[in-house]
């Protein structure tokens, strides 16, 4: 009888683990407002409004259990990610916007909750690559408030956009 009980417990546990689907959630934002006084500067810092928005993003993510924070290697994306990363005691991991959502990235982030800070022309593209469809167009150059949330549960992918004003 003891053997059958253990066998039944093993089978039940195995079946339960097979039906449990990992959830992966990506939060994708564009960097906050940047200094625009020097149009030749390809790597500007955040302006005062941008610094405030970056702080607000940190507040937004306060109660969300992030596992990782990614940003491109630009001042404005690093500065946008910084308050959230500091609040979560996480390093900011750099990613190449020309190599978005690779197999390696998908594997490393599977089952995790991740913040990705990019640009107006990379954030929607990144979301589209995760989704495997062309759902979103490039963002307006003045849109620093959109938050793309992409969730993967098993093979099901969903997404939505929220606005943080």
Whereabouts are the PLM-identified features?
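Generic beta-sheet signal
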Residues: 26, 110-118
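Sec-dependent N-terminal signal peptides
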Residues: 6-10
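C-terminal motif of bacterial Sec signal peptides marking the signal peptidase cleavage site
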Residues: 14-17
């Amino acid at each position: 009888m003891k053997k059958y009980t253990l066998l039944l417990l093993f089978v039940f546990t195995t079946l339960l683990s097979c039906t449990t689907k990992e959830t992966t959630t990506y939060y994708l934002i564009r960097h906050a407002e940047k200094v625009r006084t020097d149009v030749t500067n390809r790597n500007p810092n955040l302006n005062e409004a941008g610094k405030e928005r970056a702080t607000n993003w940190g507040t937004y993510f306060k109660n969300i259990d992030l596992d990782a924070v990614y940003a491109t290697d630009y001042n404005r994306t690093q500065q946008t990610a910084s308050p959230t990363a500091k609040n979560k005691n996480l390093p900011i991991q750099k990613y190449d916007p020309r190599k978005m959502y690779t197999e390696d990235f998908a594997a490393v982030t599977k089952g995790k909750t991740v913040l990705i800070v990019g640009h107006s022309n990379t954030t929607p593209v990144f979301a589209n690559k995760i989704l495997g469809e062309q759902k979103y167009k490039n963002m307006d150059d003045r849109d620093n408030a959109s938050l793309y949330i992409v969730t993967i549960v098993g093979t099901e992918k969903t997404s939505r956009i929220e606005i943080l004003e």
